Amino acid sequence: MAKKSTIITNWPKYLLQWGVLVALIVFITGLIPSEVAVDPEAYCPMGGLQALATYLANNSLPCSMSSLQVMMGIALVAAVVLFSKLFCAFICPLGTVHDLISKARNAMHIKSLNIRNGSVADKVLRIVKYALLFWIFYSTVNASELFCKNLDPYYAIATGFKGDITLWMSIVSICIVVLGSFLVDMFWCRYLCPLGAISNTFKFWLWIGVLFGVYYLADVLGANIPWAVLLGAFCLVGYLLEIFHAKPKLQVLKVQKNMAACNNCGLCMKKCPYHIDIKSCQGAVDSVDCTLCGECVASCSTGALQVGVTAKAKGKLWNILPAVLTVVLIAFGMWAGGKFELPTIDMKWGMEVMGPDSTMVKVVDMDDLETVTIEGLRSV
C-alpha cells in the first residue's frame, strides 16, 4: 500500500515543529530586529537539566543558565513521566531537521538503511547516547560549565560557529546529523542524542525513583557515595531497561489499538519515524521509542489507532491532546522559571551598620578590597 502524506491529517505536529524551527531561524538570524541579543540556549531543556545536576552537586550554575532553563528541563521530565517524549515529537529542532531530511530522501526514492529495532546492531548502537550522556554531565558538573556546547550541532549553527564551541566536535556532530538522518531513519535520536537517553530512562520512572531513593538513603546513612556513581548507575540502568525491557507501561497517554478495526496492512509501522512494530501490538502501543507524534494514527485508513488513556477513548480531540499538552507544559516552564531564581552565591561582603532610617545597611571599605580570581569562568 502506498504511503500517503500526513501533513494535513497530523497538522498539530507539523504546526509546532515547523513553527518552532521558523521562529528560531527568524530570531537567530535577526530578521526581526531586537535590542536584546538572542540567546539560543534560552529555553534549552538539556542545558536546564545539566544546570540542575550542577546545582544539586555543587550548589552552582553554569554561567549562562538560569531558573528558566532548569524549569524547562523539569517540564520535559514531567512530560516524559506522565505522557511521553513530547519535546522530541513536537519541539526539538534537530528532530525536525531529521524529519525534513528523511522526507527529502523519500522524495528522491532513496531507501534508508534498515537497522531493525531489537537487532544486535540496534542494541549496540543505543549504548552510544548513554556514553555521551555520562561524558557530558560528568564534564559539566565538574567544570560548572555546559560541556555540551562543545559538540551540540544546534548550538554551533545557532551561534554561527561563534559560540563557546570546539570546532571539530561541532563539525563532526553536524555531519553525523545530516548524513545519519539521510541514511538511517531517526539515527541521531535513536543512537546519539543524550537528551533522548534521559527521556527514555525517565519513561521507566519507577525504577529511577528507586535508584534515586537508594542513593539518598545511602547518603543519609553516611555512605557519602560520589555523585558520579549515581550518574553512571542512571546511564547503565537506562540502557539496560531500554534494550531488555523496551515496553514502559507507566505513562498515562498512549496510542491505543482497536484490534477489531485493524486490517494488518502495516502502514502504521512504515509511517512511524522509529518503525515501531505497531502491527504486532495488542491494545496499547508500549514502546520506549514512542513519542506520541501521531504519525501512525494519522496514516491509519481504518481508524484502528487512537491516542487515549484507554482503548475506549474516542474522538479526534484525543489525537491533538499531546500537542496541546506540549504547549501547556512549555508555558508552565516559562511561567515558573520567571517566578524564582536559584541562589548560587551566599557570600556577603562588608560591615553592617545602622543607616539613617534605622535600618541595617552594608558598608564596604574600598581600601580593604582585594582582587578575587575566579577560575572556571569562560566568556561566550
Q: Can you say where each PLM-predicted feature lies in the sequence?
A:
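Non-ligating segments of multi-cofactor redox enzymes
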Residues: M1-K271, H275-Q282, V288, V297-A298, ...
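Conserved, short, structured surface segments that act as functional micro-motifs
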Residues: T291
